[in-house]
């Protein structure tokens, strides 16, 4: 019986493996590192344990893949492996910088021979004429930065991409935590030559109660349009974003930065609460962004962890994947970022279905989206709501806790909803991941909550099943509610209202796999909603590291 159960798990694991998300063929993946474009190829490096599907503090290397469209990838030899006293215990995360002469340089974190102290290391390509950048060398002058006295030896890591100030000096941030406190910080270093680095007297930003800041990012965003700008651009037409990964989330602040005074005036501080702005409200961490000079856009990648058991990961033989690459830009309000899958993802669309006529969903209605491969799909749907009136008898949202608001089975306090999509659902709906909206009263108006519930995502045990949610910055009286979901067997990326809010869910259905998976539109609210448009596509497989060249 045990052998049969294990065989069933392995068969399910094969069908749970994604078909157009980035992941290695086997073993462990975590943080995305040093994405860049160089001589005709996009490069993505990543944290990799080549020996097992688990994290290791002593054998992490840099995996390396290249692509011409950020959709199909070829796996190359590892770029960085532990080899010197300054990184002999692991090559941890870092970033790439393109120097003025066009040469790429990597700054990364080495765990040195001295009690695995975290230090910053420079790596350079051995042959800059090689567009694939297959070989990297580590100059003998390394390491170039070591933990300052007020930072623990193991809380100093993940250098950002460097940028140039008006004085011509290079700047870079290192994620850190203050010794004996929970104050997280981004430590600023400056250099004339990318070799000798000097710590600035005060951090660029710090916040109490957040703990260690991992994988920081710092970059300008245009306030005049959607196009991205180079990381060193700093003028009146941009504001700056500082992102830090802590508490299991990727949070960011927006502010104005001056390289003359090294002052970053953020609109708010990190709080390590739900009040922090997040790239993604689901399973998403340790992201890394870069400026794509080919199409003048800023692209962001995030790591999606497994939420099953370590035992299951060993049986599968793999763990960890990346989100789809997302374009990011400033919302017209200037207060938050927008995100959307890069346009190249659309090239995977094949068979499609659509519904142009309006369709009313009364309470309890369910509508199957048939004619596509529901386990591997891209779907966009738009809803409109009948006229909303101010009704003092409706419960104000401030009286409803988040757990209730994000609960797929609760309509407490809702004017409309829950309504939305049931993805990776079984035919009897015993398995389903619900991506839905609720419209609630708040003050003198209304607010919209977007959620993704994994409570019924799988009949399997030993799987973390969470409910994620966030408020959408729209007024449902004047704007339609739209949703795009990219479904890939065991991951669902959901984008609300053009990318105002994003939620990634990692799920492992037992029944809703392969051809047995279903996709539905539903409305469980007390009031009817109108679906004004629906488009859905089957997605073809991408070539993801299936043809390693070594």
Swiss-Prot record:
The keyword Signal applies. GO terms for molecular function: fructan beta-fructosidase activity. Glycans are attached at residues 235, 272. It catalyses: Hydrolysis of terminal, non-reducing (2->1)- and (2->6)-linked beta-D-fructofuranose residues in fructans. GO terms for cellular component: apoplast. It is found in: Secreted, Extracellular space, Apoplast; Secreted, Cell wall. GO terms for biological process: carbohydrate metabolic process. Its main location: secreted. Transmembrane segments: none annotated. Pfam families: Glyco_hydro_32C, Glyco_hydro_32N. Expressed in seedlings and leaves, and, to a lower extent, in flowers and seeds. 6 and 1-fructan exohydrolase that can degrade both inulin and levan-type fructans, such as phlein, levan, neokestose, levanbiose, 6-kestose, 1-kestose, inulin, and 1,1-nystose. Belongs to the glycosyl hydrolase 32 family. This is Beta-fructofuranosidase, insoluble isoenzyme CWINV6. It comes from Arabidopsis thaliana (Mouse-ear cress).
